[in-house]
Amino acid sequence: MIALLRGLVVEKHPNQVLVETGGVGYDVTIPVSTFTKLPDLGGEVRLRIYTHVREDVLALYGFLTQDEKALFEKLISVSGIGPTLAVKILSGLAAADLILSIRRGEVEKLVKVPGVGKKTAERMVLELRDKLPAATGEEPGAPAAEALSPIDQDVLSALLNLGCARPQAEAAVRKAKAAGASLDFEPLFRRALELVR
């Protein structure tokens, strides 16, 4: 099983990176939080890998930290959550927000992640509530991005993972949209990032 992959970034997209090592290119599925921290094309990256094997598929899922990989593995232990949905969940909510929402039983916040229905959210709370560590650095009562679309939430999550404060990040996303930025992730993310700098 592949557990660690170090190589050069050949291509990168919000949920996918192509890493070349030893003359071989590996397509690795990643959450937005990993995408935002990748080096420029040609830069070296080191990813913690979860190898998913089925009879017809061998898929690699990559994370920059062991903690994020461990959270991913906890998510896929929940009945009804596979690797693809787990990556969407990690892209839809920052890790600290996700842990806090599960520990508090905030089903209504979890169902805002694309692909997560009420039953899945309830199973996440039931099966993981006591297995997750307390989230650190979380402001109690921080405003949630309830009015944002799934793409907006991806951009917000990416900004939070870069260390932006939630109020400024959310305001930047709204301003970027109001200024006519494209509704696609990358242009919206670039414009919002300019606004928070």
UniProtKB/Swiss-Prot annotation:
SMART domains: HhH1. It comes from the Bacteria. Residues 144-153 are annotated as: Flexible linker. Residues 65-143 are annotated as: Domain II. Residues 153-197 are annotated as: Domain III. Transmembrane segments: none annotated. Residues 1-64 are annotated as: Domain I. Keywords: Cytoplasm, DNA damage, DNA recombination, DNA repair, DNA-binding. One of its GO terms (cellular component) is Holliday junction resolvase complex. One of its GO terms (biological process) is DNA repair. Homotetramer. Forms an RuvA(8)-RuvB(12)-Holliday junction (HJ) complex. HJ DNA is sandwiched between 2 RuvA tetramers; dsDNA enters through RuvA and exits via RuvB. An RuvB hexamer assembles on each DNA strand where it exits the tetramer. Each RuvB hexamer is contacted by two RuvA subunits (via domain III) on 2 adjacent RuvB subunits; this complex drives branch migration. In the full resolvosome a probable DNA-RuvA(4)-RuvB(12)-RuvC(2) complex forms which resolves the HJ. Belongs to the RuvA family. This is Holliday junction branch migration complex subunit RuvA. It comes from Solibacter usitatus (strain Ellin6076). The gene is ruvA.
